[in-house]
Amino acid sequence: MTAALTLMAKDRDGPKISYQVLMIPATDASVDTASYHEYGTGRFLARAFMKYAWDLYAADAAARNNPYVSPLRASLQQLQGLPPALVITAENDPLRDEGEAYARKLQEAGVSDARGEIAR
């Protein structure tokens, strides 16, 4: 949510956001990363539940491709000018790969970032 709201605030000329902290962010509606397949069978954040939740939130492909829904799908140009970000992922979490991918994409777009990983 932080990623989408920060992008939206930039696109709509406010409010000005100085810094973003993304704690284990869900940044893509595909639910199809290696970490989802490796850790998405547990009792806390199951891949099947996340697929169900995404179906409720954004039922069709057009909605899921919207950068306000899946910030990882934003272009580098759309991400340029965002405030600095702290992206925190968890080592054994289904959302790890998409959080790390989003942090890399922010860096490619020239957004100052710091990354942290919560180890097991």
Please identify what each model-predicted range represents:
Residues 1-120:
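Alpha/beta-hydrolase superfamily serine-hydrolase fold, recognizing
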